[in-house]
Amino acid sequence: METCPVLQKETLFHTEVYAYRIPALLYLKKQKTLLAFAEKRASRTDEHAELIVLRRGSYNGATNHVKWQPEEVVTQAQLEGHRSMNPCPLYDKQTKTLFLFFIAVPGRVSEQHQLQTRVNVTRLCRVTSTDYGMNWSPVQDLTETTIGSTHQDWATFAVGPGHCLQLRNRAGSLLVPAYAYRKLHPVHKPTPFAFCFISLDHGHTWELGNFVSENSLECQVAEVGTGAHRVVYLNARSFIGARVQAQSPNDGLDFQDNQVVSKLVEPPHGCHGSVVAFHSPTSKPDCLRHVAAYTHPTDSRNRTNLGVYLNQTPLDPTAWSEPTLLATGTCAYSDLQIWGLGPDGSPQFGCLYESGNYDEIIFLMFTLKQAFPTVHGAQ
């Protein structure tokens, strides 16, 4: 397995008095700004999550370097008496509105407790910003208006985590990937199903998309193709030793062709991964071809050795490449973004990932050519 050289590597969050988990990364193209989010916790455990924090990075295209500002707390992103978890940033290019979605869970109530009691106490929340995250609106609890009575049919749920997606359709639809543990049988354990929250009116109202196959959890989505050939590609965590993927022909409402992706291995209990899509370097401007890149631990036994995979025909689950290593040793969740061309003329990526025993959250920047030098067109 080859190791990828990188343009920049920098620790953004380091566990000392507080712990940090669950990275989310968003690139704002016109502002040349990166927003790196994470959960700030009293300890590494999920029940000790507290707030969502942010570091802002300014990208210098001349030096291919990101300068990061100090950590700040997104103080509005909280419900009283609840802990804030799973940051999911989304930027609406048409309205120039930045959304930060997250879940709010009361006190120290765990996900496992909700699964055992079958009582869903998790809330769907968001804050917004019209100045690229400098200032934020008061928190909005969207649970009743978006999920409604369906909330009681779930044992619990969560969004993302990581970046969301705005589609290239006429409505500029907004998609927030999510999953819910459904109570399908009074005796059987609740079962996780991935889906998307969808907005057709730039975030004013939201609806629930339909579910992907069972045993699909934390997920991300990417848009592949254009026009009549445009589909939403979903890639989800599972407990079955490999990732699960599906595609939606109707902008995230329904998913079909649910498939196990045997080349994308999962460790026991699975792990979050990140996916982005971009135009193939070998395609003409009017070509429909897209390429997908995906980051995730590469070991099927442990959360170790973060890799990046490439798929030049993303709807084919057998077409994923062998991974290129981004980092060795213990690692876990990651979030991936792509913007512009790097100094070698190939697409450039930023990756925010958990390292060590959740000791650090690290930012990496690299190019397609650095990761996959033999890909035609990345020379």
Curated annotation (Swiss-Prot):
Reaction equation(s) it catalyzes: Hydrolysis of alpha-(2->3)-, alpha-(2->6)-, alpha-(2->8)- glycosidic linkages of terminal sialic acid residues in oligosaccharides, glycoproteins, glycolipids, colominic acid and synthetic substrates; a ganglioside GD1a + H2O = a ganglioside GM1 + N-acetylneuraminate; a ganglioside GM1 + H2O = a ganglioside GA1 + N-acetylneuraminate; a ganglioside GT1b + H2O = a ganglioside GD1b + N-acetylneuraminate
BNR repeat start and end residues: 127-138, 197-208
UniProt name for this protein: Sialidase-2
Reported function: Exo-alpha-sialidase that catalyzes the hydrolytic cleavage of the terminal sialic acid (N-acetylneuraminic acid, Neu5Ac) of a glycan moiety in the catabolism of glycolipids, glycoproteins and oligosacharides. Recognizes sialyl linkage positions of the glycan moiety as well as the supramolecular organization of the sialoglycoconjugate. Displays preference for alpha-(2->3)-sialylated GD1a and GT1B gangliosides over alpha-(2->8)-sialylated GD1b, in both monomeric forms and micelles. Hydrolyzes monomeric GM1 ganglioside, but has no activity toward the miscellar form.
Main location, first listed in the record: cytoplasm
GO cellular component: catalytic complex; cytoplasm; cytosol; lysosome; membrane
GO biological process terms held by the UniProt record: ganglioside catabolic process; glycoprotein catabolic process; oligosaccharide catabolic process; positive regulation of myoblast differentiation; positive regulation of myotube differentiation; response to ethanol
Key words of the record: Carbohydrate metabolism, Cytoplasm, Glycosidase, Hydrolase, Lipid degradation, Lipid metabolism, Repeat
GO MF, one annotated term: exo-alpha-sialidase activity
Gene name as annotated: Neu2
Record family assignment: Belongs to the glycosyl hydrolase 33 family.
Pfam families: BNR_2
Location within or outside the cell: Cytoplasm, Cytosol
Native organism: Rattus norvegicus
Tissue expression summary: Detected in skeletal muscle.
